[in-house]
Amino acid sequence: MSKYEQFRREHSVFLYRSYEITESADKVDVSYKFSIPGLADFNPGWSFPKPENVSVSGDLTFERLVFSLGMAEAVSYWKAVCSPEMIVECGELDGEQISWWKKLWFAGLGEFFYVNGINADKESFVKIVPKGKFAGTSAAELRKSEGCLVPIGGGKDSALTIETLVNAGMNCRCYAINKRCSISATVEAAGLDESALITASRR
């Protein structure tokens, strides 16, 4: 029996237990709870800057975004044992969304499967079972979209992207995860002020 099969037999269920949203005057904190029963619990989190006089309390659109970020986070912990079943105890998923997430996960795990010699099937590698409900009730306020948001990692691709868009006259804001000197340098080199950079923190 391979380790893949052994781990799946020993840890048949992975749980996406919950997410929690808290906000202060200038930021929103998000925390998640994932669990491999009998083995480990995981509690990653994010912090996002927030404009003054803006609240996300009860905002269903924001809650959906937070839930989806959790679905993207979960795979990093699921792959520790590759449980054949993932029970999602929060948020909501319909059949089409489940298929979409399975496709995204499977494609994103290609190198992981290859390096570890895992012969996984895209249909049966995981069964996603939704059991939750959203708490939010109000739709987000409609806002007019202006300019573009450019993800910045500090490498050549993001530097070229932001330079091209700025030179084309686009109104650009930059988005980064866990600020580093190379990220600030990329924004500055594009001729943008530091205030054009939105930085989220992952913990």
Task: For every predicted segment, state its role.
Residues 161:
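Contiguous, non-catalytic segments that form substrate-binding/exosite surfaces or channel walls
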Residues 157:
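Hydrophobic/small residue at the entry helix of a nucleotide-binding pocket
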Residues 1-147, 164-194, 198-201:
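RNA-binding accessory domains that recognize and position tRNA/RNA substrates
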Residues 153:
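Active-site cores of enzymes that catalyze phosphoryl transfer or operate on phosphate-rich substrates
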